[in-house]
């Protein structure tokens, strides 16, 4: 039962980040708003265990977050959104890697 609550929480975080990305897109029409939405979508896919390569998504999202963090001179709210939005993705990929060590990855 605890695992189900955790999964619902990760899905909630993902939807929340997508909503914030859409609001950011409405307020400031910028390419970085799309990255926030993509972070939320990737986290949603990973937390729902949709069968796409979560490791590849995690690498792409981490690269996008890193590139954005380099371009931002001070701590901007978008970097915080990227970090929070990437949490479900990191947790899902971590559980995938933990399962693959035991021979149970992505089943």
From Swiss-Prot:
**Membrane-related topology note:** Multi-pass membrane protein
Disulfide bridge map: none
UniProt protein name:
Uncharacterized protein AF_0098
Where is the protein found, in the record's own terms? Cell membrane
* Record flagged with keyword Electron transport: no
Q: Which GO terms describe its cellular component?
A: plasma membrane
- Keywords tagged on the record: Cell membrane, Membrane, Transmembrane, Transmembrane helix
Q: Does the keyword Kinase apply?
A: no
Membrane-crossing ranges are 9-28, 33-50, 55-72, 77-99
């Amino acid at each position: 039962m605890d695992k189900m609550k955790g999964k619902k929480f990760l899905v909630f975080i993902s939807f929340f980040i997508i909503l914030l990305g859409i609001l950011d897109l409405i307020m400031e029409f910028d390419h970085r708003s799309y990255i926030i939405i993509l972070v939320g979508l990737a986290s949603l896919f990973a937390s729902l265990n949709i069968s796409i390569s979560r490791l590849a998504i995690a690498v792409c999202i981490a690269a996008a977050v890193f590139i954005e963090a380099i371009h931002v001179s001070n701590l901007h709210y978008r970097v915080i959104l990227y970090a929070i939005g990437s949490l479900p993705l990191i947790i899902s990929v971590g559980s995938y890697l933990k399962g693959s060590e035991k021979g149970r990855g992505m089943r």
